[in-house]
Amino acid sequence: MGTGPALDRRTLLLGAAAWPLTACRRENDPSLQGGWVGAAHERGHRLREPVPAAVRPVQRRAAVVIVGAGIAGLAAAREFTRQGVDDVQLLELEDQPGGNSRAHRMDGMACPLGAHYLPQPGEAAHEVLDWLHEVGLLRHEAGRRVADERHLCHSPQERLFFDGAWHDGLLPPADPGSATMAAYKRFAQLVAAAPAFAIPTHRAGWSAAHAELDGQTFAAWLDRHGLQDPALRWYLDYCCRDDYGAGLDSVSAWAGLHYFASRHGFHAPGDAESEREPVFTWPEGNAWLTERLATPMRERLHTGRVVQRVREQRDGV
């Protein structure tokens, strides 16, 4: 039958047993095509290469050069121009400003590439409050600050799927009188009694108590206060990973407490104040805010630019 190797009976039977499994293999779907959105990595790679000798530099001077047109860069440019400094230039690596507050479009629908909501700021962030009034998200009525409901999203109450059921809020459920509920309430008391925190952080000042918290991990601080409950620590670890990208064993106690004490506090299930304020959000996420910061800066904004060096000199950089 041919000159190839013979197929013995044992090999044939083993192969035949596996034939039905080939029908279970998922076929490749050519309609699902992946792609790369977000950072322009090829521009970042240029930093590894020397500048071609044929490229002749063009010198320009500006009173202020801001490297990066994320929210911080755009806000800084806005404040400079508000203070009368008109010669402000922004250099941005990507094709669009916004940093992690940019958006993408899929089939004509906008979606965020990063930050996707804005909590209503506290009184300490009065610059942000002023700007939100300026863009129409806030207004005053009868001496009260009122948010435009068209841009608000109220947190859904059933958000945690635990033991086969949905539960209110994000905390794992706990029976009244249980050790877990006691741990929740104890942590809420400690957050309420913590040293002053604020956003922005410098509005709260810095004290020896803050330095002590900053010198220990959040896990060590919880241990010191006897907070070993697994449900509480799971939630706090989740919060730290969500905001800081690291868990209780790496994040400082200052950062862990700042997450709660600078904003909405911590509320045990059933607490009358457990409902948080609604947040501002949009289909494109915080790119909605980026657009309103960037539009007045279009003539000053230079996208697709790689900054290779910033060198300090006697009277400038």
Which residues does each PLM region occupy?
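Extreme N-terminal leader/targeting segments of oxidoreductases
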Residues: G2-A63
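Dinucleotide-binding Rossmann-like beta1-alpha1 core, especially the glycine-rich loop
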Residues: M109-A193
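Active-site/ligand-binding neighborhood in enzyme catalytic cores
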Residues: A198-G316
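Glycine-rich FAD pyrophosphate-binding loop
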Residues: T81-H104
